């Protein structure tokens, strides 16, 4: 799984060298942000169901057409799948917070996601909207410290950009 540490070590090994000063500074910065990332991961895990429901509800309220026949949320089974997928993205963000890199999202969430959604005729816009709602609603200190919130929002932005 890709993280800052594994990326640095892999690049240095491929070049047949030791990590450079810049490499080591990147690793050090990543380690210094670890406490904030772990706080964000803990808070997200504790509130995952509520965050997922609130974001999904906001999305379906903004795009009520999604519940019409022939759309992604035309019946409760499909609505439940939308919430499941949204929860999956949030869980992957949790994993990214733990490892300190985008590996979980890259490997399990983004690679091919747009192609799968396109093939199945599912729009990515509602997922982007739900994740954007989550990003914009989260605040410090209500939800987590400012540093933890910064880390959380950076991974939300990453997946939002990837699905846009």
UniProtKB/Swiss-Prot annotation:
Contains one covalently linked bilin chromophore. Its main location: membrane. It comes from the Bacteria. The keyword Transport applies. It is found in: Cellular thylakoid membrane. One of its GO terms (cellular component) is phycobilisome. It is a peripheral membrane protein. Keywords: Antenna complex, Bile pigment, Chromophore, Electron transport, Membrane, Photosynthesis, Phycobilisome, Thylakoid, Transport. CDD domains: PE_alpha (cd14769). One of its GO terms (biological process) is photosynthesis. It holds the Pfam family Phycobilisome. (2R,3E)-phycoerythrobilin 2 binds at residue 139. (2R,3E)-phycoerythrobilin 1 binds at residue 82. Belongs to the phycobiliprotein family. Heterodimer of an alpha and a beta chain. Light-harvesting photosynthetic bile pigment-protein from the phycobiliprotein complex. This is C-phycoerythrin class 1 subunit alpha. It comes from Synechococcus sp. (strain WH7803). The gene is cpeA.
